[in-house]
């Protein structure tokens, strides 16, 4: 049978104490509101005593303190214990008064102090020794008659703890007044504990000056009740003299003898007439189940505190009960239970429970969870400490002084004992008397001294008073000054608040509010900036408007010609034409598109799938009479727009805009209106300045740029296998708006947001809705060409595309398809755009799209110049994820490439943003607000032409990307090599290069920073180091494999710890390196660890790249690592299959690393991406990382700090590089290498992975410990060979030897004769460069020289092999591709004009255009005669000393012939340099000086004339090409046949000559050229054949 327990404890069998009678098991519900016996509290608190009655215990003596009141009175005492004020002087008197609510089966518990003061100590104290849990000897089991008068011994004064606990002692020492004061003090403590103020009446009651009103009423009620009790007792004294003794025995008997009986009420104590009372609620507010109803002896039938007191005039219910049961009522008060026996009973039960609990805890099962087992062990150890605690408590209590108790503290003399005086004490008394006299004398003197001191103090006080008066005056003046300072501070705060408000409005782009605040402040600089902004934006607005007007005029001309051609074709009954004027061919892409048709009578329009295909249009129109082809409406104006040419531009633009705003396919007008309203609202919201400008009555810059807007609600039907996201549709709508408004732009979405898909969507949308079928030219990096092809195949398979790449033969095979025009998109790379411009530039491209457009950030780069010079593409779009990498001119270069008519001058653009106050003469330094204002106006300028969205803004579903920089240690080999390279710029060797093998040597290397980076990555990147170590470690072939690969490098050792963990948890890795030689070492390491990997670097072919991507991305791919170079593999690749990116060494340009990271962190990634950037501690890599972080911080501001501070020079940049190489104090605290646990936290995505990684580390350490030949993870110094461990003096000696050998040679050893002079003359070398056989020609010349010598080497073959192996000398130059014939001809014409110009006596020096035309026939002095060829260096040495770059016309003509000039600008530079050299060397006013000025102007005039001719020629070419395009198919075929016949007849003729012959017939200004027509034809023939061979 288990005892009842509380919900938190475990049930256990009933107690069985050792010897002596055992109490029976406790049956039924818990006997009272307290905790049940089995709980922890039951062990500490009171134990149930003898059988309890069924109603609560009455208060003895008086009913003034019911049980609930006692419980509430105990709360402040708990607060006293909690607040730590137990040592207070009133605490002792309060502790005995406040009692816990009594257990129904026993008396109220008391503190040990109270027990001690009552003259007894518990023989078995509580195990925990808590004062509030010590049991009281007074039991609630046996009731006390309530009629006991207060005068009798044992009468109880309410609230007296001593009287309550000791009924047999005398009257209490407390008077009623003291008790009232004590209650008031308890109430005061209670209120103070709650933080409440004390009322005045309570304060007086605490001091004993007045009693509380409630207490006075209680006194009166108490007196009345005592009188009633005395009367009742006197009435019952006579008949009740004898029965008390059996009743007392009957009450004590259960407590002393019968332990086996249950603790419920006994039958001899119960009566049938006792009413059942509800149990008193527990302190927690939860009522305990009521015990069973039981009869009660008459003496115990006193009502509890819950029964209301009867009025004085009515008989008490107690009297009525006693009258009914008068036959068994005792005559006098029955004696109470013996408290000692009750205490013993409680202790027995506690010991039995403890013993049973210990036994139960010792026998716990082994399958318990760890946390429960820990709790059980703690409990078992606590129970075993019980006897020790008991002994300790007894010793402590025995040593307590009795005068600390409440009773003895009040009467301190009660316990004094008289003491006999002895002789020794008498002597001591005399001694003390003498000391007393001495002390009195000392006090007298002290008093006199104090008197003197008081006089002096008065003097001090007098002075202090007057000083304080002066201080008050000072304080007053200081307060006035403080008031003024506070006022000034408040004004300053107000100014700052206004500035913050201004900044807030500026950041929120509230321009109207910002301008108002500027006007209030009267800030001249900010007002000037705003004025500049308005002027510049107004200027740009005008430029945009003019650009759009010019484009619209060109479009009108084309439309007019097309319309005219269409009418002619309609009259001649020609075949149907496409929208661009060309005839529709069944094999062309247009034949698959639906053509919109309309019914002539009903006006019904068929479009989309219902409309007929272009190839079946004629047959469909015959089968469906009444239909005709509907006029096009989207991008072109209707026929009425062509006819009304004099109509105002504004109205036509509004009509066009309305035409696009209102959806032509919707049927209800209300829908149209609603859409128009929404579109207008959208424009207002989208444009950050439209509201302000409309308020001022002018039109917004953005609104002017995007005047024609078109709503794009869904993607094209040609775009299949996927749906565009919302932000991608917005990007498509923005690009369509650029198309509609004849503008170009930059799509600069962050990497990974699908710029490729948006571009394909634009192409398909234009093909479907605008009938613009191309051709589209897409220029991409080689690494992404395969990805673009894959995306086109996936998203737009119906688009005909050509991948223009491969060998020259492969590219040549694509030319017929290019000429036929049966394609939509041409994909090619930057290199082929430059190389094959003579083929690709002949096609008139409709759209040019450049991927990774930041490649064109240099305006003078070859790609930009070739595209601008040779290619015709009116519409252009740049795609880039990083539009602003470094400086402002790079951004201008992009904008100038897109919109040259708007962004003309770089200097104006840069000056406007860099030095806004340069013209005003003020300081140029900008504060934060001015900087932000400039950034805002840059945004304002870029807004119509640049669209950029970030991942965090548009793609919230994308998982997180977390980057960690992991510091790596160096091996001993790395540290030594790094130290010497950093200090001296030398690399230690084993001396084999000087035939001192094993003795050591040093090799000086250039580009120290690069060598330091290589040492940080891996020391075996230096081949001689690896070969020497391979010999030292016993490896053959000079190649090291196995564990020594990662022991030599700290980064490799870190990878050796990380990669196995990532493979075990199925995390796939992209590993980016900067150096391909490092990738080779990495491959050896992967082979050692059996990691399956793929490698992609700059040498990987384009077709192989697509296969590698496919292998890695396929679902069940077995490849764990993809090894990529940062530059080749970091652009445009989709590698979402990996979720871990390791950047082995950081790039100087942080955007390269960001591009690399985003190969994995892009749309489609499902897992969290971890980027681990490895960095060697205390090395150059930390400086590179810091520089990269600085650049990234700059990029976040859009404009970097260098744009506003133009003070940095090349000297400062050199100093910065030098600072990187200087020694710095090592800061080991900052550069802590992470331990395994930190590393695991970085790479683990979940808690389970972290635990697995920790176990793997433990297994690795155990395995290393078991290995008898174990070595440390990193190479240590004692493993290094002797030649590498050198002290600084020896390294200095080796360095000096190296320098001496460079200067003096190697001493006695005969040096090999090496001829360092050029074996070839300059002509031979140039010819060899052209032919591409430089090495063979050099080798031939050397062999000829060698044959001439008498002492021929015995083994020349060996030397040849050695030389061929080393390939010393000038590297083979790449053969230059020839310029277009047209450009070469123009250059020759200009130079010949300048050379042949002759001076006439009757003409001014500076020629006009008319003079240039007739100068061929003029006679006079030829000005260029002196400039044709310069004198030699021997003839005129001073010229070559003064002029650094000499040049003459002969050299210029040679360069034209060798295609050194790529544009007329390059030619102009050399001609201007020639004239400038002449002006520098010759005196001003001399003949040559004046001739050079004339030749400058002649050159410029000739170039202008050539440019005008080119423009007129282009216009005529455009007209002819359009006419050719609009001819019928049969005519086109016949033209092709004629061209082929002409080619056969004129084998060497240029293929475009037949076309251009009519142009030559036109009258145009003739530039004099002394070459005859035959010579020109021969030159054109040779150039044409050259291009054909290409």
UniProtKB/Swiss-Prot annotation:
Helicase C-terminal domain residues: 1054-1216
Positions with biased composition (Basic residues): 555-564, 1552-1563
One Pfam entry name: BRK
UniProt biased composition (Basic and acidic residues): 651-661, 1352-1363, 1542-1551
Annotated residues for binding of Zn(2+): 1459, 1476
Sites bearing N6-acetyllysine, chain numbering: 190, 604, 997, 999
Every Bromo domain range: 1378-1506
Species whose genome carries this gene: Homo sapiens (Human)
Any one GO molecular function term: DNA binding
The keyword Amino-acid biosynthesis belongs to this UniProt entry's keyword annotation: no
GO cellular component: bBAF complex; brahma complex; chromatin; GBAF complex; intermediate filament cytoskeleton; intracellular membrane-bounded organelle; nBAF complex; npBAF complex
Oligomeric form and interacting partners: Component of the multiprotein chromatin-remodeling complexes SWI/SNF: SWI/SNF-A (BAF), SWI/SNF-B (PBAF) and related complexes. The canonical complex contains a catalytic subunit (either SMARCA4/BRG1/BAF190A or SMARCA2/BRM/BAF190B, mutually exclusive) and at least SMARCE1, ACTL6A/BAF53, SMARCC1/BAF155, SMARCC2/BAF170, and SMARCB1/SNF5/BAF47. Other subunits specific to each of the complexes may also be present permitting several possible combinations developmentally and tissue specific.
Stated name of the protein: SWI/SNF-related matrix-associated actin-dependent regulator of chromatin subfamily A member 2
Location of the protein in the cell: Nucleus
Entry's EC annotation: 3.6.4.-
Reaction(s) the record says it catalyses: ATP + H2O = ADP + phosphate + H(+)
Glycyl lysine isopeptide (Lys-Gly) (interchain with G-Cter in SUMO2) crosslink, residue number(s): 1302
Binding site for ATP: 749-756
Origin superkingdom: Eukaryota
Entry similarity comment: Belongs to the SNF2/RAD54 helicase family.
Biological processes, Gene Ontology terms: chromatin remodeling; negative regulation of cell differentiation; negative regulation of cell growth; negative regulation of cell population proliferation; negative regulation of DNA-templated transcription; negative regulation of transcription by RNA polymerase II; nervous system development; positive regulation of cell differentiation
Record PTM text: During apoptosis, cleaved by cathepsin CTSG to produce a 160 kDa cleavage product which localizes to the cytosol.
Entry keyword Ribosomal protein: no
Boundaries of every Helicase ATP-binding domain copy: 736-901
Positions occupied by motif DEGH box: 851-854
Biased composition (Low complexity): 37-46, 216-240, 262-275
